[in-house]
């Protein structure tokens, strides 16, 4: 979708850049309420993920990540905004009367036809196993476990690439730069996720950020020593350490956060950047 630039009529709209209007009129049988508890806190009520809280109430849209309506063509009826993700979603009317939401593929418009199955065309929005795709195909919504539904490359603008097939496995290059093996029988959707220009948006004011459930970010160097290892000192002072740390004293900016000795380590041929 196109990016709309605000006219500078007030201070809050200065330098603002948002998406052109995308309607949100979800079907009642494809949404349900969700209790957003925690706000970045663990079971003891301690903040473990900062800068979260508040925000507008949301209704969760049921997204079809499995694409298990096999060999039944569907038509794109609407393209809608989803408050739970940065990608758009589109409503599909299938030939058997089923109605489902899927992630909006880039370039898809209202009226286009999609289908999933084993012997379907390699065209945008179609879902099929990796074994039936030619090398170099751009894909998204990729399964890791057969039948579990897509788990990889689902964010706005995300796209992976099929680079090799050997034996029972296919080699993919993921959006993070990681190269890993996936079973050739797993399903994936052809094309790139839409809303590629999401990073070009500028909310323009703090209130718009609060609506999204994101709270202000405060630097540790301006805190007190009791609140952050970087805090304290007279006036503007350095952090007083060799390397930056988290509020809990662990190394920040570059520390590997992946758990060691995971079963999937053998499937990763090259780590993410």
Swiss-Prot record:
Q: What is this protein called?
A: Large ribosomal subunit protein uL2cz/uL2cy
Query: Can you state the subunit structure given in the record?
Result: Part of the 50S ribosomal subunit.
InterPro entries reported for this sequence: NA-bd_OB-fold (IPR012340), Rib_uL2_dom2 (IPR014722), Ribosomal_uL2 (IPR002171), Ribosomal_uL2_bac/org-type (IPR005880), Ribosomal_uL2_C (IPR022669), Ribosomal_uL2_CS (IPR022671), Ribosomal_uL2_dom3 (IPR014726), Ribosomal_uL2_RNA-bd_dom (IPR022666)
UniProt key word Plastid:
yes
**Alphabetical keyword list:** Chloroplast, Plastid, Ribonucleoprotein, Ribosomal protein
Q: Does the keyword Plastid apply?
A: yes
Q: Give one GO molecular function term.
A: transferase activity
Signal sequence interval, chain numbering: none
Listed SMART domains: Ribosomal_L2, Ribosomal_L2_C
Source organism's superkingdom?
Eukaryota
Q: Which PANTHER family match?
A: LARGE RIBOSOMAL SUBUNIT PROTEIN UL2M, RIBOSOMAL PROTEIN L2
Where does the record place it? Plastid, Chloroplast
Task: Indicate where this protein is primarily found.
Answer: plastid
Among the Pfam families in the record, one is Ribosomal_L2_C
Q: What biological process terms from GO does the record include?
A: mitochondrial translation
The species is Phalaenopsis aphrodite subsp. formosana
Q: Which GO terms describe its cellular component?
A: chloroplast; mitochondrial large ribosomal subunit
Region spans: Disordered? 1-25, 224-273
Stated family: Belongs to the universal ribosomal protein uL2 family.
Read off the NCBIfam families from this record.
Answer: rplB_bact (TIGR01171)
